[in-house]
A protein has these predicted regions:
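Divalent metal-dependent phosphate-bond-processing catalytic cores, especially two-metal-ion Mg2+/Mn2+ enzymes
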Residues: 2-154, 174-204, 215, 225, ...
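Active-site alpha-helix of zinc metalloproteases
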Residues: 208-212, 221, 252, 272-273
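A short glycine/small-residue-enriched secondary-structure motif
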Residues: 162-167, 207-218
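Short alpha-helical hairpin
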Residues: 150-168
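An amphipathic alpha-helix signature
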Residues: 161-165, 187, 191, 238, ...
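Helix-adjacent hinge/juxtasegments
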Residues: 220-264
C-alpha cells in the first residue's frame, strides 16, 4: 500500500471517530479524538498492517492502540483486551453496577472497539470469505423480497452498532472458547440449506433464517459466571431480541434446542436452524481450547447424547425421536 493510501486509511478512521454517534457514546470530544489520532503514529502503524494479506488479530490492533489509549489514563487491572471484551458483553446485556464501577474506562473501550471494527471492515473487503470466521449476510436488495426484511435490517444495524462481531473476535483471543466459529458455522450451514430449499421452490424466508442463525447463541454472552450456559443462553438470546423489537427472528433464534423439534407445527426456518446447530460441533484440543467442525448427523447424535443430563429410557426415546426428524429432513 502506498503512503498515500495509508494516509487515506488513517484519515478515514479519524473521520469515523469524529462522527456524532461515536462522540456521544464514548463521551470524547472532537479535540480528544484528534489527540488520540496523532497523524505520524497512525500512518506509521497502519503501514505495518496495510495492505491486509491475512486476518488481523485483536492483539495486533491493540498494539496499535496501546499508545493512544495510554493518553486516556491508566489501563484496567485485567488489561484493555479482557476489559473491552467484558465491556462489549455489557453493551448487549447492560448492568448498572458494571457501568458505574468502570466509567473511567468506557471511553478507551469504545475507542478500541471502533478501531477493531474499522480494521475488520477493511479485512472483510479484501480477504476471501471463510465460513467459520465471518458472516455472509444478505444485501439490502436481496433481503427486500422477504417478509422479515425490516426486522433483518434492524438486526444488521444492531449487529454493527453493538460491536457483536468484534465481541466474538475478542472472545476467541481472551477466553478458551471459539464461539464465533460455532455461530458463523451454524449460519453458513443454515444458509446453505436454506438457499437450496429456496431454489427448489420451498417457501422459506432467508432473512429470518440468516438473522436467527447469526443470533442464536448471543445469549451465551449474557450468562453470568455462576449460571449454566447450556440451559440459560436461550433465555438471554430471547431477551436481547425482545429488547430490540425483533419478535419473529428472536422466536426462531431462541428456540433452537434439539427438544424444540418435538412439536409437529415447526416452521421450516426453525427446522433449518436446529439442523445446522446440530451439525456444527465443538471438541477440545490438548491445550483446552475449542475446535469447531461440521459433523455428520450420526456423529452429532453421539456428541449430544454424551452431554445430556439424567438420561433414562424415556429421555433416550425422546432424543431418538427428534433425531429421526432431523434424519428425515436431511433425506428430504
Amino acid at each position: 500500500m502506498s503512503k498515500k493510501e495509508v494516509r487515506q486509511a488513517a484519515a478515514e478512521l479519524t473521520e469515523r471517530l469524529c462522527e456524532k454517534d461515536f462522540l456521544d457514546r464514548s463521551g470524547l470530544s472532537r479535540k480528544n479524538v484528534m489527540m488520540l489520532m496523532n497523524k505520524d503514529h497512525w500512518e506509521e502503524q497502519f503501514a505495518h498492517i496495510f495492505p491486509i494479506k491475512k486476518r488481523i488479530s485483536c492483539r495486533a490492533v491493540y498494539e496499535i492502540c496501546e499508545e493512544p489509549l495510554s493518553l486516556l489514563g491508566h489501563e484496567p487491572e485485567e488489561g484493555w483486551m479482557k476489559f473491552t471484551y467484558q465491556y462489549v458483553c455489557h453493551i448487549l446485556y447492560p448492568d448498572a453496577e458494571f457501568k458505574k464501577e468502570n466509567a473511567a474506562f468506557s471511553a478507551g473501550a469504545e475507542f478500541y472497539l471502533a478501531v477493531l471494527q474499522f480494521v475488520f471492515d477493511r479485512e472483510r473487503a479484501v480477504l476471501p470469505y471463510k465460513p467459520m470466521e465471518d458472516f455472509a449476510f444478505l444485501g439490502d436488495e436481496e433481503a427486500s423480497s422477504f417478509e422479515c426484511a425490516a426486522e433483518y435490517s434492524r438486526f444488521k444495524k444492531f449487529f454493527a452498532q453493538e460491536y457483536i462481531y468484534e465481541m466474538m473476535r475478542l472472545n476467541a483471543e481472551v477466553t478458551p472458547f471459539r464461539t464465533l466459529e460455532h455461530i458463523a458455522g451454524v449460519h453458513y450451514v443454515a444458509m446453505t440449506v436454506a438457499r437450496g430449499l429456496y431454489a427448489a421452490g420451498v417457501p422459506i424466508d432467508l432473512t429470518l433464517t440468516s438473522g436467527a442463525a447469526a443470533g442464536h447463541d448471543l445469549g451465551k454472552f449474557g450468562c453470568k459466571p455462576n449460571e449454566r450456559v447450556p440451559y440459560l443462553h436461550y433465555y438471554y438470546t430471547n431477551q436481547w431480541f425482545n429488547n430490540h423489537s425483533m419478535e419473529y427472528i428472536g422466536h426462531i433464534a431462541a428456540n433452537h434446542s434439539t427438544w424444540d423439534l418435538e412439536p409437529e407445527n415447526l416452521s421450516v426456518e426453525s427446522l433449518v436452524l436446529i439442523y445446522a446447530d446440530f451439525r456444527v460441533k465443538q471438541s477440545r484440543g490438548d491445550d483446552g481450547r475449542e475446535i469447531t467442525y461440521i459433523s455428520n448427523l450420526d456423529e452429532a447424535f453421539n456428541v449430544i447424547l454424551s452431554k445430556l443430563d439424567n438420561v433414562d429410557e424415556v429421555k433416550l426415546n425422546r432424543y431418538r425421536f427428534v433425531y429421526s426428524k432431523l434424519h428425515d429432513f436431511e433425506d428430504y
